[in-house]
Design a protein with these regions (language model features):
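P-loop NTPase catalytic core of nucleic-acid-dependent motor ATPases
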Residues: 61-174, 178
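N-terminal nucleic-acid engagement/recognition segments and initiation subdomains in replication
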Residues: 1-86, 90, 101-105
Length: 265
């Protein structure tokens, strides 16, 4: 098997993944279909008769090296030359906001929190949700937020609506780098709003993964961001320091001048 494929155990998703040996392509999950294909290939080419369940048991052992793909990505980014600067500023210049005085300061703090959350298991390092608001639809708000996720990590980006009191959100917090809430914040009732505030800052989540026997605790990995059509979304008249709202006037699609690698490094 090692001659044909490279294997790793993804500690974020708690599953074994594979790719062709010596390939630089993305790893893919070992699904039931893949397991059956492995079994068929072993039987046909090597004369080894075994079960798909036996192969799965082997692959979910120290046969596959453990990897945290998100941390591996950040650890392989190049070290920046101190003389180089302004990568965040160039990205933020693609967005014209109504309150530009705080835009770079608070975005930078939030982005640092994203990386800190991903690199540390203890506690929640990012206590805020970046929110882009605006009266106009089709301003590319959600698109711009989605592009903050590196291409190699797109499997760790969730964009859509959430249930703050449901079980699925616990999986998203433990297994994703970004949760992009798409035009939902102004629809939340008071109960769901309070639940979301708690989720943003919770240090860990507890749930039982499919096919696991016990409920286990997992560190808070995800950082929250959101887009809203309109400028009013908080039902609490006193506001909330958990949300960092910026009213978008215009978004220009980033050009090649923006270095996303340097931005995240």
């Amino acid at each position: 098997m090692n001659v044909l494929y490279d294997f790793r155990f993804n500690t974020v998703k708690s599953r074994t993944e594979y790719r062709a040996a010596s390939s630089s392509g993305l790893y893919q999950p070992v699904t039931k279909f893949v397991l059956n294909s492995f079994r068929r290939r072993l039987d046909a080419t090597a004369g080894i008769v075994t079960s798909a369940e036996n192969i799965r048991t082997i692959l979910e052992s120290d046969f596959a090296r453990k990897v945290h793909p998100i941390r591996e990505y950040f650890n392989t980014l190049p070290l920046l030359n101190p003389a180089e600067h302004g990568h965040i500023g160039r990205l933020l210049n693609t967005v014209q906001v109504a309150n530009p005085g705080k835009w770079e300061e608070y975005f930078t703090k939030w982005l640092i929190g994203v990386v800190a959350n991903a690199m540390n298991d203890t506690g929640c390092q990012n206590h805020t949700c970046l929110v882009l608001t605006g009266d106009k639809q089709g301003q590319f708000k959600s698109w711009w937020l989605d592009n903050l996720c590196p291409t190699p990590l797109k499997n760790y980006l969730f964009t859509g609506k959430i249930d703050p009191q449901g079980k699925d959100i616990l999986t998203l917090i433990a297994e994703y780098l970004f949760i992009n809430i798409d035009d939902q914040l102004k629809e939340l009732n008071k109960q769901n709003e309070n639940a979301l505030k708690n989720l943003i800052t919770t240090p860990a989540v507890k749930y039982r993964r499919p096919y696991d026997v016990y409920i286990e605790e997992y560190p808070h990995l995800a950082s929250f961001m959101a887009s809203v059509n309109g400028n009013e979304f908080l039902t609490d008249p006193t506001g909330s320091r958990r949300f960092l709202p910026f009213e978008v006037l215009r978004i220009d699609k980033p050009t090649a001048a923006v270095s996303y690698t340097h931005l995240r490094a």
